[in-house]
Each structure stands twice: as structure tokens, then as C-alpha cells.
């Protein structure tokens, strides 16, 4: 998962709220989380003392399978980024998912983004998932 999915689930105002929450609450789904994901969502919530938001994200991290960065993940991210024209954080998220053996990567990004060109893993957009 990426930060956009978590933010959509937390915000409750996004058009993607129900879809994002359904993904996070699916008991048959293993969520893959990482330091990259933490860095995208936690610092601002902590800095601004948004306790409920922090608790929400922490619950997701506690439920997820935590994958730490490694030189192999960084090398994979570099390869993905240059092969598919990915932004740095998108490449890291996808490399983490691949390292974890995930069957798919779900993002809150719109379907036209470069991450959806990646062939190494099925990347899906919340925008195309029916709740």
C-alpha cells in the first residue's frame, strides 16, 4: 500500500474513503508496510499532535508485515525507477512490495501514473476498485 491509500482511509472525506478502508480492513489481505510509508504519514501527524490520526496509522502498521529497507530493496527501486520512469518513493514502495512477495500493490494514485506501467507486480489504483 502507499501513503495515498492510508490518507484516503483516514480522511473520511475523500471519494476513495470506503475503498481504502475496505482494503485496510480485509482480513484476508496481508498489508506490507515500511519505513518509507511511515515517513510519508507519521511525521506530520506526530508533529501536529494529531493523536487520533497517529493511532489510526499505528494500528495499520501493527497489523502489517513490516519490511525494512535493505541495499537489495534500494537496488530494486533504482532499477524500477529507471526502467519505468517512476518517482523515487513510488519505486521504493514497489520494491518493498516485491521484496515481500506481495501479489499486488494498491495505490491511491490515479491510473495514469508511471507506477501502473510496472510489469514486475500487479499495481492497482483505488480509483478503479469498486467498494
Question: Predicted regions span which residues?
Answer:
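Acidic catalytic patch
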Residues: 12, 36, 62-83
